[in-house]
Design a protein with these regions (language model features):
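Active-site-adjacent structural elements in enzyme catalytic cores
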Residues: 1-173
Length: 176
């Protein structure tokens, strides 16, 4: 497989990445902390690709990235009011909440747990990709399991070139 390198400065970046996500592919996406390895969090086959690409144990649950507060109830239930207050105060940003999962969230995403982790990344391009894909994106850090976190597209390229569908380059100087 040839890995595409998509510049966040390109108007087609989000659309291309979202289409890859919608068709079950893997895209490395930027967050405010590290690059994530993203796939459709509701598509079991796509989620399994994340575990395979990372060499991640399947008993390690994934985080669902969403566009905002309005999506919490789509994937979670029995949500305490405090969760909405936290999301209002800290999203978008590096706050992850673990809440009871709806049945629509695959067991492979939650590692069989009754809960799911949700967060709203503070990256405009990543939220745009999530919105255009129309699904939450399961995205653990893009590093190979056990290796240091991937903070640049170059790190992602080193670990995954030819093994994932695309890398969204946050900065043009981040070119792999």
């Amino acid at each position: 497989m040839e890995t595409l390198f998509l510049s966040a400065n390109d108007s087609k970046c989000a659309e291309t990445a979202a289409n890859i996500i919608k068709t079950g592919g893997l895209v490395a996406i930027p967050t405010e902390t590290v690059y994530g390895l993203g796939a459709d969090g509701l598509n079991e086959n796509a989620v399994i690709k994340i575990f395979e690409a990372k060499g991640r144990p399947q008993d390690n649950p994934l985080i669902l990235h969403v566009t905002g507060i309005e999506q919490i109830s789509l994937f979670c239930h029995h949500i305490p009011e405090s969760a909405y207050r936290l999301a209002e105060a800290f999203w978008p940003g590096p706050l992850t909440m673990v809440l009871p999962a709806r049945d629509t969230v695959p067991k492979c995403t939650t590692a069989g747990l009754p809960t799911v982790a949700v967060r709203c990344p503070d990256s405009d391009i990543t939220r745009k990709i999530i919105a255009l894909a129309g699904v939450p994106i399961a995205a653990p850090s893009a590093n190979i399991s056990g290796k240091p976190s991937t903070t640049t597209a170059e790190h992602v390229r080193h670990d995954h070139d030819g093994r994932i569908d695309a890398i969204c380059l946050l900065y043009t100087s981040d070119a792999a």
